[in-house]
């Protein structure tokens, strides 16, 4: 009564297979599956705390900054001399 019977579903499935073909249906199913998998992965990644840092926010004392700066300038001057 008002519902779709198994025979009607089978007829609709046969018509869909005839219209689209099995290869295209298989491809669409694979695309749908990968989209659902990607969505689930994104949702699970959102729940985990972010351990990765986007930038270096650790405080450094002045001596560390001077040492790093002098090492960078030394490397740059060596590179400039090699190119010349």
Curated annotation (Swiss-Prot):
Give me the Gene Ontology terms describing cellular component.
TAT protein transport complex
List the biased-composition ranges (Basic and acidic residues). Answer: 42-66, 75-84
Classify the protein's membrane topology as the record does: Single-pass membrane protein
UniProt entry tagged with the keyword Transmembrane helix: yes
Just give the chief location class. Answer: membrane
Lineage top rank: taxon: Bacteria
Q: Does the keyword Protein transport apply?
A: yes
Q: Where in the cell is it found?
A: Cell inner membrane
The alphabetized UniProt keywords are: Cell inner membrane, Cell membrane, Membrane, Protein transport, Translocation, Transmembrane, Transmembrane helix, Transport
Task: Quote the InterPro entries the UniProt record gives.
Answer: TatA/B/E, TatA/E
What transmembrane ranges does the database entry give? 1-21
Q: Where is this region: Disordered?
A: 40-84
Gene3D superfamilies, sorted:
1.20.5.3310
Q: Which Gene Ontology biological process is one annotated for this entry?
A: protein transport by the Tat complex
What Gene Ontology molecular function terms does this protein carry? protein transmembrane transporter activity
Subunit structure, briefly?
The Tat system comprises two distinct complexes: a TatABC complex, containing multiple copies of TatA, TatB and TatC subunits, and a separate TatA complex, containing only TatA subunits. Substrates initially bind to the TatABC complex, which probably triggers association of the separate TatA complex to form the active translocon.
Give the similarity note. Belongs to the TatA/E family.
Q: What does this protein do?
A: Part of the twin-arginine translocation (Tat) system that transports large folded proteins containing a characteristic twin-arginine motif in their signal peptide across membranes. TatA could form the protein-conducting channel of the Tat system.
Among HAMAP family, the record links this protein to: TatA_E (MF_00236)
What's the protein name?
Sec-independent protein translocase protein TatA
Which organism does this record belong to? Vibrio atlanticus (strain LGP32)
